UniProtKB/Swiss-Prot annotation:
This is CD209 antigen. Residues 96-303 are annotated as: 6 X approximate tandem repeats. Residues 59-381 are extracellular. It comes from the Eukaryota. The lineage of its organism: Eukaryota, Metazoa, Chordata, Craniata, Vertebrata. Pathogen-recognition receptor expressed on the surface of immature dendritic cells (DCs) and involved in initiation of primary immune response. Thought to mediate the endocytosis of pathogens which are subsequently degraded in lysosomal compartments. The receptor returns to the cell membrane surface and the pathogen-derived antigens are presented to resting T-cells via MHC class II proteins to initiate the adaptive immune response. Probably recognizes in a calcium-dependent manner high mannose N-linked oligosaccharides in a variety of pathogen antigens. Keywords: Adaptive immunity, Calcium, Cell adhesion, Disulfide bond, Endocytosis, Glycoprotein, Immunity, Innate immunity, Lectin, Mannose-binding, Membrane, Metal-binding, Receptor, Repeat, Signal-anchor, Transmembrane, Transmembrane helix. The keyword Iron does not apply. The gene is CD209. Ca(2+) binds at residues 324, 326, 328, 331, 342-343.
Length: 381
């Protein structure tokens, strides 16, 4: 194989020499090797240039593809955001609709519980006022207040709308009438208060129209019974051992105090027993007030006499405070003072105590239908 290669090399060398001669070059030593290298260098440069150009073309071809991919990603994101926005909008609307639906459901339930006619609200208000009035009975109420409340209640009951449970209301009214019949004692007033509370609850469920007349009649009888409430003593008077006593809240001289008691059918207090004396003395000392009693020696100095004309019993003389009565400066009228009695000038203004007999109360139901005696108002306080 070496023999075959040598002729080829020789031929290549001869070809190069001929080319150089044609170009006017002189043949020198080592020239052959340099020309061979230069001949191969151009080929290498061409290969390198082609490689660089190919790489550049590849990179340039990739750049539009990257831009296209980024644009596609942005389009996808935009579409996703659009869909998400639409979904959120639908979710918000659904939430609002759900909230509105719940509100309407509650409103529907509330409306479903409403009474059929606006009259029920008026009845409820009337019963509330009636309950408040009766709740204050033990303190400083009057029969006139109860009468007015029952009159208004009677007027509204006549307009009651439909719905049943009349029997329950009828029973409540029967119990209420029975409680009113037992009212002479203050403790019974609480019973009426409870009955009225139950009546209010029953009326809230309303009877049928056909039964309204029966309820109207019951309330009319009840009103008459309340109007004739039998009490041992008028309002603001205190009961003790069959008598009623009024303690004034203002002051007058002795003679004006006598007149004030007479104007209400009573008299300035006349003491008849030791128990009564102790009761009155306690009332006076608790209030820390000096109060006139119906005792004086105006007609004859030293002779003490009650306003009913009876003389002072010798057994009562020990109720005078020590050194009393002393008649200093024309002191002719007796008063409750501290733990005993004192004489003072009759023109001095003091509190006073009236006394009258207590009413006789019968629990017979027929008595409620009979005219009741007029109840005296307390004297101006």
């Amino acid at each position: 194989m070496s023999d075959s290669k040598e002729p080829s090399v020789q031929q290549l060398g001869l070809l190069e020499e001929e080319q150089l001669r044609g170009l006017g070059f002189r043949q020198t030593r080592g020239y052959k090797s340099l020309a061979g290298c230069l001949g191969h260098g151009x080929l290498v440069l061409q290969l390198l240039s082609f490689t660089x150009l190919a790489g550049l073309l590849i990179q340039v071809s990739k750049f539009p593809s990257s831009i296209s991919q980024e644009q596609s990603k942005q389009d996808a994101i935009y579409q996703n955001l659009t869909q998400l926005k639409a979904a959120v909008g639908e979710l918000s609307e659904k939430s609002k609709l759900q909230e509105i639906y719940q509100e309407l459901t509650r409103l529907k339930a509330a409306v479903g519980e409403l009474p059929e006619k606006s009259q029920q609200q008026e009845i409820y208000q009337e019963l509330t006022r009636l309950k408040a009035a009766v709740g204050e009975l033990p303190e400083k109420s009057t029969q006139q207040e109860i009468y007015q409340e029952l009159t208004r209640l009677k007027a509204t009951i006549g307009e009651l709308p439909e719905q049943s449970k009349l029997q329950e209301i009828h029973q409540e009214l029967t119990q209420l009438k029975a409680a009113v019949g037992e009212l002479p004692e203050k403790s019974k007033q609480q019973e009426i208060y409870q009955e009225l509370t139950q009546l209010k609850a029953a009326v809230g469920e309303l009877p049928e129209k056909s039964k309204q007349q029966e309820i109207y009649x019951e309330l009319t009888r009840l009103k008459a019974a309340v109007e004739r409430l039998c009490r041992p003593c008028p309002w603001e008077w205190t009961f003790f051992q069959g008598n009623c006593y009024f303690m004034s809240n203002s002051q007058r001289d002795w003679q004006d105090s006598v007149t004030a008691c007479q104007e209400v059918g009573a008299q300035l207090v006349v003491i008849k027993s030791a128990e009564e004396q102790n009761f009155l003395q306690l009332q006076s000392s608790r209030s820390n007030r000096f109060a006139w009693m119906g005792l004086s020696d105006v007609n004859q100095e030293g002779t003490w006499q009650w306003v009913d004309g009876s003389p002072l019993s010798p057994s009562f003389k020990h109720y005078w405070n020590r050194g009393e009565p002393n008649n200093i400066g024309e002191e002719d009228c007796a008063e409750f003072s501290g733990n005993g009695w004192n004489d003072d000038k009759c023109n001095h203004a003091k509190f006073w105590i009236c006394k009258m007999s207590a009413a006789s109360c019968s629990r017979d139901e027929e008595q409620f239908l009979s005219p009741a005696p007029a109840t005296p108002n307390p004297p101006p306080a």
